[in-house]
Amino acid sequence: MGQKVHPVGIRLGIVKDHTSVWYADGRNYADYLNADLKVRAYLQDKLKSASVSRIDIARPAQTARITIHTARPGIVIGKKGEDVEKLRQDLTKQMGVPVHINIEEIRKPELDGMLVAQSVAQQLERRVMFRRAMKRAVQNAMRIGAKGIKIQVSGRLGGAEIARTEWYREGRVPLHTLRADIDYATYEAHTTYGVIGVKVWIFKGEVIGGRTEELKPQAPAPRKAAKK
């Protein structure tokens, strides 16, 4: 059975950037890495309803700069900036260095892999049929301008006795093309029957000359579906 490399990891330094940017010697590397994991877990827990896609962490000159990519910046910032200021104070205490927080809004959440995976998982937890949830997400992404999208769900789908995997795809998802800008994300849906895994691949175009091809809305391609 063929195994696939992580679509983001293989493209780091080509069309994808690292989410943690800092340098550490051998003594501090593990501490920095552990601190990053704790910061991300803390923010994901605090901002569950804020549609957070990605958290970037940089450590320039004895400070920390955290960039939160979210589709709902108002929830992160709070009334008159109270919520984001409290986050900054908590993170400064946790990391032990001054923290600066930047908020970046995601203009098209339908084209963000993590937000699409979260949306599908939330629908599965509300007992929406998995085929309907996948089809709706695929249609929305293609309507906004994705070149291709694939969604896969695995587990006890519909409460079945035996776990299985099903997927739905439209357009192209060229995993072997390194210049292809593919957004990949995974998420878990916790249902009464157990955990259902959700994987999303979104092909946004090829990066040529340092910029991605302009995304244009297009008509949906013929449906392609299969199951294992």
From Swiss-Prot:
Gene Ontology molecular function terms on file: mRNA binding; rRNA binding; structural constituent of ribosome
One GO process term, biological-process aspect: translation
Matching InterPro entries: KH_dom, KH_dom-like_a/b, KH_dom_type_2, KH_sf_prok-type, Ribosomal_S3_C_sf, Ribosomal_uS3_bac-typ, Ribosomal_uS3_C, Ribosomal_uS3_CS
KH type-2 domain ranges (all copies): 39-107
Keywords, alphabetical: Ribonucleoprotein, Ribosomal protein, RNA-binding, rRNA-binding
GO cellular component assignments: cytosolic small ribosomal subunit
Cross-referenced Gene3D superfamilies: 3.30.300.20, Ribosomal protein S3, C-terminal domain
UniProt-listed Pfam families: KH_2 (PF07650), Ribosomal_S3_C (PF00189)
Subunit structure, interactors included: Part of the 30S ribosomal subunit. Forms a tight complex with proteins S10 and S14.
Similarity comment: family membership: Belongs to the universal ribosomal protein uS3 family.
Purpose: Binds the lower part of the 30S subunit head. Binds mRNA in the 70S ribosome, positioning it for translation.
Protein name (database record): Small ribosomal subunit protein uS3
Organism from which the protein derives: Ectopseudomonas mendocina (strain ymp)
Lineage: Bacteria, Pseudomonadati, Pseudomonadota, Gammaproteobacteria, Pseudomonadales
